[in-house]
């Protein structure tokens, strides 16, 4: 049996015969996007490209971003967040499984009132971490300064989009804070919890 991405039939408007396309391309046509892995430059660029293309194609139809991600790199995650704010269509964010670290940052970036978590989803927030533990002292100081700026940026976004006071978000980001779907709703990261 072949292994790979499943194919599904798709008929373009005005065509008689359907062609077989991979399931993700079919879902993209319905404006359904998926972040189902660690956030890195590759997936970030793919999602940014899709959001820009789909918003040019039709700026009146909303986009739906499904998230099941353990987090990942800060800059590619912030790039996804910024694109979500930039495109004209509203971007709904849907947490299924886990939205941790940058995954939760992207989740909170959905259009306010259009952020959803599945009932058994988990959300985790924390401060950004450095990957340069073995850097020279001078490099480490520069890295620490940049890390503090990024932490401040992420904290401000959480404060703005959750309505929580700055001191609460700052304190919570000091460590890994895991939340259930209903706890994430109470915190303001999502607006709705899907019913079972």
Swiss-Prot record:
GO BP terms, alphabetized: protein quality control for misfolded or incompletely synthesized proteins
EC number(s) given by UniProt: 3.4.21.92
Cellular location(s): Plastid, Chloroplast stroma
Keyword annotations: Chloroplast, Hydrolase, Plastid, Protease, Serine protease
GO molecular function, one term: ATP-dependent peptidase activity
Active site residues per record: 101, 126
PROSITE patterns in the record: CLP_PROTEASE_HIS (PS00382), CLP_PROTEASE_SER (PS00381)
InterPro entries associated with the record: ClpP, ClpP/crotonase-like_dom_sf, ClpP/TepA, ClpP_His_AS, ClpP_Ser_AS
Leader peptide range in chain numbering: none
Function as written in the Swiss-Prot or TrEMBL entry: Cleaves peptides in various proteins in a process that requires ATP hydrolysis. Has a chymotrypsin-like activity. Plays a major role in the degradation of misfolded proteins.
Assembly: Component of the chloroplastic Clp protease core complex.
Stated family: Belongs to the peptidase S14 family.
Protein's name according to its UniProt entry: ATP-dependent Clp protease proteolytic subunit
Naturally occurring in which organism (per UniProt): Nicotiana sylvestris
Gene responsible for this protein: clpP
